[in-house]
């Protein structure tokens, strides 16, 4: 069955990729992570409005589900929701070039979902 074989072949539909297509040498690695990234964090702390200037947050969404209503199949749970959330993330990237991260929650009551203030 083509539906299952594609999912099994690729072990999911999405991945993250580096924007820097060049070789990541020691100097770049030190800049992208530690210690160089500290300067970027300090710049954002000084001016939070600069967050999109330095990070992917200007082109990022979360695709979130608890698996309680999967494509008309009903409540199949969060694990069964993951391929659907990946598919939605794929659509965001393919049609709008928006990076999307699938997130499934193992809670079903709104009161169980404790979301703090968004920082992005």
Model features per residue range: what roles?
Residues 1-2, 119:
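Short, small-residue-biased leader/transition segments that mark boundaries at the very start
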Residues 6-11, 15-22, 88-100:
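Extended, charged alpha/beta regions that create polyanion-binding interfaces
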Residues 8, 51-57, 64, 93-94:
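Solvent-exposed alpha-helices and their adjacent loops that cap or buttress functional pockets
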Residues 12-53:
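An N-cap/entry alpha-helix motif that binds or orients negatively charged groups
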Residues 24-25, 65-75, 92-102:
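Gly-rich Lys/Arg/Thr-decorated short loops/hinges at beta-loop-alpha junctions or inter-strand turns
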Residues 38, 45-60, 73, 86, ...:
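Short, glycine/charged-enriched hinge/interface segments at domain edges or termini
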Residues 46-53, 94, 98-117:
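An N-terminal-biased, well-structured beta-alpha scaffold segment characteristic
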Residues 71-85:
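Glycine- and acidic-residue-enriched helix-capping/strand-helix junction motifs
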